[in-house]
Amino acid sequence: MRIDALALRNFRNYDALNVTFAPDCNVIVGENAQGKTNLLEAIVYLSSAHSPRTRADRELISFGKNEAKLTAQAFARSRDFLLEVSLAAGKRRKIFINKVPAKKGSDLTDVLGAVYFCPEDLLLIRDGAAARRRFMDDALCQLRARYAQALSDYHRAYEHKTRILRDSEEYPSLLDTLPEFDLRMAQSGAVLIYYRARFCERLGEYARTAHRECSGGREELGVTYQTVSTISDPLAPIETI
């Protein structure tokens, strides 16, 4: 797969950008704070419908603007694709693949895959659990469509629950709907826990082999996934978590 061209409008620091890429390796150079990372962020967003730097799509829209658009011409699976994402403040984003509305953001991953590396990756070790969850979310949303859907469902239920708790003092009857959203969060959360545990298990296998080679066989590296204390076995079937 490859990206042949990219167009941005009102995305981060770009009022308008149109760029074409070589079919092989491309090197992006420039002064600091000129938008190199923003360009890479746009490519990642077009491959996953998620930014590796923020969870709020509003932050991707240029300051003082109300909407943004990302467009890419890509080649994958022996055919051409046109990927389009429109962002608008206070509205749901719109995603089109070859002018056809996408049912979900993970449909982009079926066309374009991207791996994003940055200096902040060191925060996986130095920072708290939130950075590690974000890393797994970004990877698994591209690898497993079911995970991407579960993550979206979880956040949606969480936002509903937050609004209910916020407004319950004025409208106490809203509290009657809390169990429904608790159930939705539990169901989606079970899917997230299962896939994260499997991801860490596979990652540990590769990391163990690589570290053994780097240390000349003198050291062993292990990766384990620890979730909430009420989950005794995160690798158990989803229905039992």
Question: Whereabouts are the PLM-identified features?
Answer:
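Short beta-strand segments
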Residues: 15-19, 79-83, 221
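An accessory alpha-helical subdomain
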Residues: 123-217, 227-228
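Short loop/turn motifs enriched for small/polar and acidic residues
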Residues: 88, 224-228
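Phosphate-binding site recognition
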Residues: 15-16, 20-21, 44, 53-61, ...
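Nucleotide-state sensing region of NTPase/ATPase domains
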Residues: 48-131, 137-147, 204-209
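Small-residue-rich helix-loop
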Residues: 227-241
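Pre-Walker A-like glycine/lysine-rich segment at the N-terminus of P-loop NTPase domains
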Residues: 1-45
